[in-house]
């Protein structure tokens, strides 16, 4: 059965309210929020917005719905400006799960590391393979920020070292660190769902005994590590810089991403006095800041 899709443009201030209105008043069977500028959402700090500044609200309707009536209802809600931009499309019914699965393939990062969907055969059984189900967690390796961190980890000698994954999300970086030789990894995240995802993915990869996960309030006192990786956002990286630097042993190595190239210098300023920084690495408008703690 075909479906009708209506896409509206909104701001982060009214997108969720518009989504509620579409579900409750116009008969939408589902509503999805997409970034109009193709930027991913990262876990925000408490009080920060969860949506983008320029958000597309996409509503799905059964094919026999009257789109002109739906658009009148949207207009009558006064939640969008007069003459609001919209797009109406017919969407063919598909095996969405199969199509979704077909979009994910094993990906190589650095020399040794592969991230593989669990339903696919690993390309190189002798490589370091992390099995992950895209969609069951927050990070899958497809975004440049995750790729930058994975490539950095692959380039380190992690043998016997302790690693902290600050903002662990799916646990992809934590699991990769263990598979690359780390003795122990501690994952920290403000979202309990992220901790569950990390545990599930660690178990899927057989490394659950080497990974511990904590909410910030529960992390061990005096926690320090040889290596810290933080793939979050520029704002938290600046605001939490004393905490992040405090997690590093003297001589320890730090990598940070989730940073747009235009934000790199403003983040680096918070770390330059305490770390010997490497050249900034860039990928598709995103960047990685890394360095070694002085002392």
From Swiss-Prot:
S-adenosyl-L-methionine binds at residues 146, 167, 189, 231. GO terms for biological process: methylation. Its main location: cytoplasm. This is Ribosomal protein L11 methyltransferase. It is found in: Cytoplasm. It holds the Pfam family PrmA. InterPro entries: Ribosomal_L11_MeTrfase_PrmA (IPR050078), Ribosomal_PrmA_MeTrfase (IPR004498), SAM-dependent_MTases_sf (IPR029063). It is an enzyme of class 2 (transferase). GO terms for molecular function: protein-lysine N-methyltransferase activity. SUPFAM superfamilies: S-adenosyl-L-methionine-dependent methyltransferases (SSF53335). Belongs to the methyltransferase superfamily. PrmA family.
């Amino acid at each position: 059965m075909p479906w009708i899709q209506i896409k509206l443009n909104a701001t982060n201030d009214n997108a969720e309210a518009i989504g509620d209105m579409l579900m409750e008043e116009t008969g939408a069977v589902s509503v999805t929020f997409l970034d109009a500028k193709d930027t991913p959402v990262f876990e925000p700090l408490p009080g920060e917005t969860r949506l983008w500044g320029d958000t597309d609200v996409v509503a799905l309707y059964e094919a026999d719905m009257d789109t002109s009536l739906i658009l009148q209802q949207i207009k009558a809600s006064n939640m969008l400006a007069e003459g609001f931009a919209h797009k109406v499309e017919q969407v063919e019914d598909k095996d969405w799960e199969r199509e979704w699965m077909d979009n994910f393939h094993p990906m190589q990062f650095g020399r040794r590391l592969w991230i593989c969907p669990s339903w696919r055969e690993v390309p190189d059984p002798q490589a370091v393979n992390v099995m992950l189900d895209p969609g069951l967690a927050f990070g899958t390796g497809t975004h440049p920020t995750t790729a930058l961190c994975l490539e950095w980890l692959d380039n380190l000698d992690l043998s016997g070292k302790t690693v902290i994954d600050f903002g662990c999300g799916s646990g992809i970086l934590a699991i990769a660190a263990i598979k690359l030789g780390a003795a122990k990894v501690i994952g920290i995240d403000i979202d309990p769902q992220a901790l569950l995802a990390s545990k599930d993915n660690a178990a899927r990869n057989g490394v659950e005994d080497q990974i511990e996960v904590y909410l910030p309030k529960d992390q061990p006192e005096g926690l320090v590590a040889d290596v810290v990786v933080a793939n979050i956002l520029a704002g938290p990286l600046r605001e939490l810089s004393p905490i992040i630097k405090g997690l590093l042993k003297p001589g320890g190595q730090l990598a940070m991403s989730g940073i747009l190239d235009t934000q790199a210098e403003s983040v680096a300023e918070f770390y330059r006095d305490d770390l010997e920084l490497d050249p900034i690495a860039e990928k598709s408008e995103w960047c990685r800041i890394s360095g070694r703690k002085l002392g």
